[in-house]
């Protein structure tokens, strides 16, 4: 999967995250489209932002904020008792997590709820166990 477009909130935390993520992911040549609508956006607003892309991108990266992103994922991926990745998002979409979804659409204007499937979900603690929440042994 080659990301060909990035749409991001212009919030400082997002810009700092992308400054680190883009070179590490080999996508530092892509200039993000900074979209103020993403800041504090509901899932409905995020769907509108995505639909506005039309056919201008095949593989899209959205960098934004919760609860909107978590709600968006849960709206796009249908519930399934066997979907462990969706269950992890239902538990929590932590800061700096990455969710990869696939959709069978050629035009982002065709985006609809319950139309995506999980391919990957990576939390910071999946990459570095020291980032896991503290657990009590008592």
Predicted regions and their residues:
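Phosphate-coordination/substrate-recognition cap region in phosphate-metabolizing enzymes
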Residues: 1-58
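Domain-level recognition of soluble alpha/beta enzyme cores
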Residues: 77-119
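A glycine-rich beta-strand to alpha-helix segment
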Residues: 57-79
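Alpha-helix N-cap/helix-start capping motif
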Residues: 11-15, 66-67, 95
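Conserved histidine-centered catalytic loops in small-molecule metabolism enzymes
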Residues: 3-25, 103-138
């Amino acid at each position: 999967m080659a990301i060909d477009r990035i749409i991001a909130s212009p919030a400082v935390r997002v810009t700092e995250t992308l400054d680190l993520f883009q070179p590490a992911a080999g996508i530092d040549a892509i200039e993000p489209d900074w979209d103020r609508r993403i800041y504090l956006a509901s899932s409905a607003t995020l769907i509108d932002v995505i639909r506005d892309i039309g056919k201008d991108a095949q593989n899209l990266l959205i960098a934004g904020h919760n609860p909107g992103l978590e709600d968006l994922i849960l709206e796009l991926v249908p519930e399934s008792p066997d979907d462990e990745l969706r269950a992890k998002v239902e538990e929590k979409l932590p800061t700096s997590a990455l969710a990869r979804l696939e959709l069978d659409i050629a035009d982002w204007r065709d985006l609809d709820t319950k139309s995506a499937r999980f391919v990957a979900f990576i939390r910071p603690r999946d990459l570095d166990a020291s980032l896991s929440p503290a657990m009590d042994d008592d």
